[in-house]
Design a protein with these regions (language model features):
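Extracytoplasmic
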Residues: 25-59, 80, 166-167, 250-256
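Hydrophobic core of transmembrane alpha-helices in multi-pass small-molecule transporters
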Residues: 35, 103, 115-131, 242, ...
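Cytoplasmic helix-loop-helix junction between adjacent transmembrane helices
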Residues: 120-157
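Structural signature of the two symmetry-related core transmembrane helices
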Residues: 91-105, 298-313
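Interfacial helix-cap and linker-helix signal at transmembrane-aqueous boundaries
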Residues: 51-52, 83-84, 165-177, 259-260, ...
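Helix-loop-helix hairpin linking two adjacent transmembrane segments in secondary transporters
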Residues: 155, 159-205
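Extracytoplasmic gate region of multi-pass secondary transporters
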Residues: 44-48, 231-289
Length: 421
C-alpha cells in the first residue's frame, strides 16, 4: 500500500511507503538491534550460578537481579515508547546503546549484590534493553498493514534470536575468562554495534492507516473493544500478560540453575536455554503467519494452551535427554504469545491509541517475567526443589487461559448481536 506521506526531506514518499523495500530493510535492522539488546535479558540467567557463589547468596536473592532488570525493562518500555513517539525511534536507540554499554561495564565491576542490581535495573533494564524492544515493536507496526502479524513476529523474534545466541556465548566466556570480564566485553560490544545501527532508523514512519480485517479474525469494529469498556479490556489484557509470563519465566530463568542442581552442569542448562529460545524463533514466525489468518485472540488462545502442556511435561521428566526435548517443546509452543497482544490491540482498539496500549501490555508481560523469576526462586528456597515452582507456573497459565476464553466469548457474543441487528 502506497503512502502519501513524505518522511524524509527531498525523498519521494514511495521510497518510504508502508511495506516498501525500505520497510523490510528497516525490519531487518530492527531484528538485529533487538537481538543485540536482548543480551540484557539473558545475561543474568546464565551468570546466576556464578553470582550466587561469588556473593554467597540464597537462590531467591540470586534471582533478584533478574527481577529488577525485568521491572526496569517493563517501566522503560513505556518511557522509551513515549520518547520515540515524540522524537522518533533514533533517540531511544542511541541512548539505549550507550546505557547498555555503561550498564554491563558497571555491573561487571560491581562490588556486591546491590550495586549489581542497580546497574542491571537502571542502566541495563530501564534505559538499555527497554529502548531496543517496545519502541521497535511500535515502530514496526507503523510500517506494515496487510503483513503486520508476520512483521511483528519477525521483529520480536530478535528477543529469541538473542536468547539462542547469548547463553552459550556468555557461558563460554564465563568459563574461560570469568563473569566480570564477560560483562565488560559485552558492554563494549553493545556500544559499538547498537549506536551505529540506530542511524539507519532515522526516517520517521509514514502516516498510520486503518488496520485491515484479517480473514477469520475475531476483530469487531466497535467503541467497546471485545464488548467491554476500553479500560476493562485493557486491564484484562494486562492481567493476561502478567499471568502468561509468570508461567513463561520459570523455565527461562531457572533452567540453568535447575540443570546444575540435577548434576548436569550449568553449561548443559545454558544449552537448553539456547534450544528453548531457538525454537521460540520458529514458534514466533509460525505464529505470526497464523495470526495474519486467524487473528490475535485465537493465536493467543493457541499459545496459552500449548504453553500449559509444555509446562506439565517438565514435571515427570528430569533426565538430560528428556529435558532437552521438553525445553525444545516449550520454546516451540510459547513463542507466539507476546506478539499476539500487540496484534489484538491493533485489531480491537483505535490505531491512534495503539502505541500507549501496546507499551502498557508489553510492560505487564515483562513485569510477569520479573515476578515469575523471583517467585520461582523463592519457592525453591522454601521447598528445596523446583516441582512446586513448575506447579505455580501452571496455575498462572490457567489464569491466562481463562481470561482469553472470556474475551473470546465476549467477542463472539458481540458478533452475534451485530448479526441479529
Amino acid at each position: 500500500m502506497a503512502s502519501t506521506a513524505t518522511v524524509a526531506a527531498g525523498q519521494p514518499a514511495s521510497r518510504y511507503a508502508i511495506e516498501s523495500r525500505y520497510a523490510w530493510l528497516r525490519l531487518a535492522v530492527s531484528l538485529t538491534i533487538m537481538t543485540i539488546g536482548g543480551a540484557g535479558m539473558y545475561a543474568v540467567p546464565v551468570t546466576l550460578p556464578a553470582i550466587e557463589a561469588e556473593f554467597a547468596l540464597a537462590r531467591g536473592a540470586a534471582s533478584l537481579p533478574y527481577t529488577v532488570t525485568m521491572i526496569g525493562f517493563g517501566l522503560g518500555g513505556v518511557l522509551m515508547g513515549r520518547v520515540a513517539d515524540r522524537f522518533g525511534v533514533l533517540v531511544p536507540l542511541v541512548a539505549g546503546g550507550m546505557a547498555l554499554g555503561a550498564g554491563f561495564v558497571a555491573a561487571g565491576m560491581a562490588p556486591g549484590l546491590w550495586a549489581f542490581c542497580l546497574a542491571q535495573g537502571l542502566l541495563i533494564g530501564l534505559l538499555g534493553t527497554a529502548a531496543t524492544f517496545s519502541p521497535l515493536v511500535a515502530d514496526t507496526s507503523q510500517w506494515f498493514d496487510r503483513r503486520r502479524g508476520i512483521a511483528l513476529a519477525i521483529c520480536m523474534s530478535g528477543n529469541y534470536v538473542g536468547g539462542a545466541i547469548w547463553p552459550p556465548v556468555m557461558q563460554h566466556f564465563i568459563e574461560s575468562a570469568g563473569w566480570r570480564q564477560t560483562y565488560i566485553g559485552l558492554g563494549v560490544f553493545c556500544l559499538l554495534t547498537i549506536v551505529p545501527l540506530a542511524w539507519l532508523m532515522r526516517p520517521r514512519p509514514p502516516a498510520l492507516v486503518t488496520t485491515p480485517q484479517v480473514p477469520g479474525s475475531t476483530a469487531v469494529r466497535s467503541a467497546l473493544p471485545m464488548g467491554l469498556r476500553p479500560r476493562t479490556a485493557q486491564a484484562l489484557l494486562c492481567v493476561a500478560g502478567v499471568s502468561c509470563c509468570v508461567a513463561m519465566s520459570m523455565p527461562q530463568v531457572h533452567i540453568v540453575a535447575y540443570c546444575a542442581d540435577l548434576g548436569f552442569g550449568a553449561a548443559r542448562g545454558a544449552e537448553m536455554l539456547a534450544v528453548m529460545l531457538g525454537m521460540g524463533i520458529v514458534s514466533r514466525l509460525v505464529s505470526g503467519w497464523i495470526s495474519d489468518r486467524i487473528g490475535g485472540l485465537r493465536t493467543l488462545l493457541l499459545g496459552s494452551v500449548l504453553q500449559g502442556i509444555a509446562l506439565l511435561m517438565f514435571l515427570p521428566f528430569d533426565g538430560l535427554v528428556s529435558l532437552y526435548l521438553v525445553s525444545a517443546m516449550f520454546g516451540l509452543f510459547q513463542g507466539g504469545i507476546v506478539p499476539a497482544y500487540a496484534l489484538i490491540i491493533r485489531e480491537h482498539f483505535p490505531a491512534a491509541e495503539a502505541g500507549a496500549r501496546v507499551g502498557m501490555v508489553l510492560m505487564c508481560t515483562l513485569l510477569g517475567m520479573a515476578l515469575g523469576g523471583w517467585m520461582s526462586g523463592a519457592i525453591f528456597d522454601l521447598t528445596g526443589s523446583y516441582r512446586a515452582a513448575f506447579l505455580n507456573g501452571i496455575a498462572w497459565n490457567a489464569l491466562n487461559l481463562a481470561i482469553v476464553l472470556f474475551l473470546l466469548s465476549r467477542v463472539y457474543a458481540m458478533r452475534g448481536r451485530l448479526g441479529r441487528a
